[in-house]
Amino acid sequence: MGSNLSPQLCLMPFILGLLSGGVTTTPWSLARPQGSCSLEGVEIKGGSFRLLQEGQALEYVCPSGFYPYPVQTRTCRSTGSWSTLKTQDQKTVRKAECRAIHCPRPHDFENGEYWPRSPYYNVSDEISFHCYDGYTLRGSANRTCQVNGRWSGQTAICDNGAGYCSNPGIPIGTRKVGSQYRLEDSVTYHCSRGLTLRGSQRRTCQEGGSWSGTEPSCQDSFMYDTPQEVAEAFLSSLTETIEGVDAEDGHGPGEQQKRKIVLDPSGSMNIYLVLDGSDSIGASNFTGAKKCLVNLIEKVASYGVKPRYGLVTYATYPKIWVKVSEADSSNADWVTKQLNEINYEDHKLKSGTNTKKALQAVYSMMSWPDDVPPEGWNRTRHVIILMTDGLHNMGGDPITVIDEIRDLLYIGKDRKNPREDYLDVYVFGVGPLVNQVNINALASKKDNEQHVFKVKDMENLEDVFYQMIDESQSLSLCGMVWEHRKGTDYHKQPWQAKISVIRPSKGHESCMGAVVSEYFVLTAAHCFTVDDKEHSIKVSVGGEKRDLEIEVVLFHPNYNINGKKEAGIPEFYDYDVALIKLKNKLKYGQTIRPICLPCTEGTTRALRLPPTTTCQQQKEELLPAQDIKALFVSEEEKKLTRKEVYIKNGDKKGSCERDAQYAPGYDKVKDISEVVTPRFLCTGGVSPYADPNTCRGDSGGPLIVHKRSRFIQVGVISWGVVDVCKNQKRQKQVPAHARDFHINLFQVLPWLKEKLQDEDLGFL
């Protein structure tokens, strides 16, 4: 705290049907299935197992780099015995074991050679391809066997360009029948016994030189897509879908153009989110799925597009929560709110798995009354995202509904204008019980795009959507964080800066600050004295141990801590703000990002307000005349933690400010406005809730409003009435008059705008 006072020197249509298996991990020695199968003799050599579906199935688990042989899962049969251990060629095995993962070998490679040749390849082994004279290599010349049993890179293809279509290649592990690539010629692909084909089994050479469908691959049961692979492939395809060429943009029918991220306001997209709430899911997986969808909505919104959403949950029967026809269905915040309010128990009484009914609910929202298409129906794009293990247990085959949707949207009927761009079906297989044949049948198959994915578990799926959001293009966006379970303190508070001022013979002073641009950190002026030299000021960001070089500290010209000493006020904190200018430009990353400042274009976008929004309108949005939920970031036991407080900006504002009289040195102040000027925001006290207080070392840190998943700084921590952190420990019991005061950034905007005018923040 300060000298006598307490300045605190001291944060498309999409479908989601999740059928992930409801996994419960249990030590096998203690577990007992709720079914009738004994656990005796089911253990696996070199690994362990866990029970699924309340003991009706089990999954074998092996260390990284190994896979369960001969099967990954077993089911409890009605006879009271576990399903037999059988190899891919149907031979019975007595005991399961963990075997080293190998990558498949190329069965065929046309018009070239590969080296080394081997019946199988171990993890980290490399293979190289080269072409015969007259042929050109496409794809990856060198590939590495990865820990998930897949080869890195892209399919190597040797082509001489003689065909109407280019050579479609032979993905490693597949066999191809057909070597003519003329218009309307077809090729077919096959997998070895025991492997499942993903992608298109048959591909046809089409007008324009492209192949129908998507590149196939052969999958073993232990193979999974990594979160990074899924995020890259899905996001690549998704951004292709977010806008396409419509029928009125001057391009001829069937003409393929690169689709853009920015959606034409006159265009149309519907996004249907459909979650499976059946018994096989489990509450934790259902909650995880909702988190994924929230992140997906955020991702789409970050592109500045406003599709219409539909929201459906289902088990035996579907339940429609949001219809695309509703007025608010394009409001991402409103849709997110509806999504967060859904409970897993909503389908508890009828908990079958009727994927077909869920898709029919989507079909009903796509269709139009009296079978009369509305104007512009053929410019609406549709995307379906289905998360499932493919094991629907009632209602019939859901693929028939996909066919009906294609028919409704007039897709694939006109060879010259097949309209394939207007429907994308993404299928995520989640968990060990995935039926790869079924999920592949449901997914779209498009050239150079991937629409079917298999992820290991819900944890991996959440990784996918976090990676989608946190791509490099968004690093400069203000107020964004990486709210991931694996994230560090600085992933979650990437703007937070630690400041230390070393004063010879006087020790050192600690403060906080916030990164507001690539060259500036915003903090409190009282953290420094006029005698402090730049070399004595240490600033660190992103949790890095190295200190940043300081060019200059800029004080607000109206700040003067001794300005009212003659009036008997020992310390005066009006205009208590300063900017630290760094010598070198910060490099933004996941742990170093700027916070949003009021009255900037970045905050307008963060709040999803119209581009014409004024500074006053931002103020009304962020600081309405009421109690405002906010937060600050404090360091406790070397960890950054968020503390939730309420800014008293309504009927409690006066009493909050009057409690300043309890601060040391202010007890004789007759008019509290002498020390609490209009530049201050007040937090603390016990109403409407007991607010935590700032500590010595928190000074200069940001007071933050968290809205629409973005963080906007509205204040700078300045001073407090009570020192609640004596002896380096935060007191649990504090008086009701323990208040904290923060400089309101809306009140110092002219100064901020002047000093940050070259930082490309777009002040309004």
From Swiss-Prot:
Glycosylation site residues: 122, 142, 285, 291, 378
Mod. after translation: Cleaved by CFD following activation of the alternative complement system, generating Ba and Bb chains. Cleavage and activation takes place when CFB is already associated with complement C3b.
Any one GO molecular function term: serine-type endopeptidase activity
Signal peptide positions (record): 1-25
Active site per the UniProt annotation: 526, 576, 699
Keywords: Age-related macular degeneration, Cleavage on pair of basic residues, Complement alternate pathway, Disease variant, Disulfide bond, Glycation, Glycoprotein, Hemolytic uremic syndrome, Hydrolase, Immunity, Innate immunity, Protease, Repeat, Secreted, Serine protease, Signal, Sushi, Zymogen
Location of this chain's protein in the cell: Secreted
Effect upon mutating residue 689 to F: Decreased cleavage and activation by CFD
One GO biological process term: complement activation, alternative pathway
Effect after changing residue 644 to L: Decreased cleavage and activation by CFD
Pfam families: Sushi, Trypsin, VWA
InterPro entries per record: Compl_C2_B, Complement_B, Peptidase_S1_PA, Peptidase_S1A, Sushi/SCR/CCP_sf, Sushi_SCR_CCP_dom, Trypsin_dom, TRYPSIN_HIS
Site (Cleavage): 259-260
Consequence the record notes for mutating residue 533 to R: In AHUS4; benign
Keyword Disulfide bond found: yes
Domain Sushi: 35-100, 101-160, 163-220
Binding site residues for Mg(2+): 278, 280, 353
GO terms under cellular component: blood microparticle; extracellular exosome; extracellular region; extracellular space; plasma membrane
Function according to Swiss-Prot or TrEMBL: Precursor of the catalytic component of the C3 and C5 convertase complexes of the alternative pathway of the complement system, a cascade of proteins that leads to phagocytosis and breakdown of pathogens and signaling that strengthens the adaptive immune system. The alternative complement pathway acts as an amplification loop that enhances other complement pathways (classical, lectin and GZMK) by promoting formation of additional C3 and C5 convertases. CFB is cleaved and activated by CFD to generate Ba and Bb chains; Bb chain constituting the catalytic component of the C3 and C5 convertases.
Binding partners and assembly: Monomer. Interacts with complement C3b; this interaction is dependent on the presence of Mg(2+).
Domain commentary: The unliganded VWA domain has an inactive 'locked' conformation whereby the scissile Arg-259|Lys-260 bond is protected from proteolytic activation.
Illness the protein is tied to: Macular degeneration, age-related, 14: A form of age-related macular degeneration, a multifactorial eye disease and the most common cause of irreversible vision loss in the developed world. In most patients, the disease is manifest as ophthalmoscopically visible yellowish accumulations of protein and lipid that lie beneath the retinal pigment epithelium and within an elastin-containing structure known as Bruch membrane.
UniProt similarity note: Belongs to the peptidase S1 family.
Protein's recorded name: Complement factor B
The species this protein was found in: Homo sapiens (Human)
UniProt gene name: CFB
